[in-house]
């Protein structure tokens, strides 16, 4: 409405961030709650970062030579982070859920954790559910574990220049959580042709990419070319080793 008032002669286009994830099957978007909660309140997985996942998966398909069949995992890793499993250009699963709080560990968001932690913290901290939810969203994730920052660059600096143990733990926990989703999506896709990293962390944090791929290497046969991984560039590039079974 504000833009229509400010720019009445300009066309307006709605781009829904969840649209790319509307191809999920019911068994992937439903939660194991009473089914009427879905029918009455529309509680289901919606996902996020859809525009990014769609664009990046399309670019990867081009890089693969436009095959008829493709199995791709897109890792959109920024301050907010999500993964998606893309089969033949269509999303079949994604890590964010009913809200963007779900899924992998993020800059200041905890991602998916045991739901029973909520009432426990309410009692221990004498806080309301909304106050604990604020902690989940704004004081957790990389920030909560490192005690330094929600920015991976600050954590990387503390790790390599100061040897900070919490910075090390943050990277290890982050990579382990992301690699779990990669393993899950490998199974759902029935194999894997490529893993794509995008967004601020995915494109720039070489050490986190290495930790993530190292976690997956034995199971998936995926390996990085260390020299290619270390290069910072705005261009799409292959950073996997020539003998890797999966392109990165």
What would you call each of these model-derived segments?
Residues 71-75, 130-139, 194-196:
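Beta-strand segments within the central parallel beta-sheet cores of soluble alpha/beta enzyme folds
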Residues 10-13, 189-200:
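Short glycine-rich phosphate-binding loop at a beta-alpha junction
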Residues 23-122:
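Glycine-rich phosphate-binding loop of actin/hexokinase-like ATP-binding domains
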Residues 87, 93-128, 134, 199-232:
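Catalytic phosphate/nucleotide-handling subdomain of diverse soluble enzymes
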Residues 134, 141-145, 152-188:
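Adenine-nucleotide phosphate-binding core of ATP-dependent small-molecule kinases
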Residues 168, 172-192, 202-248:
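Internal helix-turn-beta structural module
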Residues 1-14, 18:
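Conserved phosphate-binding loops in N-terminal lobes of ATP-dependent enzymes
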